[in-house]
Amino acid sequence: MQFTKRLRDPIARGEITCSVRIWRQPHVKVGHSYRMGEGRVVVDALRQIKLEDVTPALARKSGFAGVVDLLKTAKHGHGDKVYLVEFHYEG
C-alpha cells in the first residue's frame, strides 16, 4: 500500500489505522504486510463499502479534512468499488 507523504508519520505513530480506496478489485490482502518507510503496514481487515458510507468522521479517521479531500486521493485508476482497509503499523 502506498500513502501520500503527509500521512506516513501519523500512520507510523498509530494515529491513522484505516484507508478508503476506490479500486476495480482489491490491491491488498488481509494478513499481508506492505513496506512503508522503515516499517510495514499490516492489513487487518478489508471490506467493500458503499460510497455513502464514507462520512466526514471516516474521512478524518483516515487522515483527511473531509470527504471531498479523501475522494480526491482514494480513486486509483478506473475502479468504481469502494473499499475500507484497516491496518496497523509495525516499525
Language-model segment annotations:
Residues M1-G91:
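Mixed-charge, low-complexity intrinsically disordered regions
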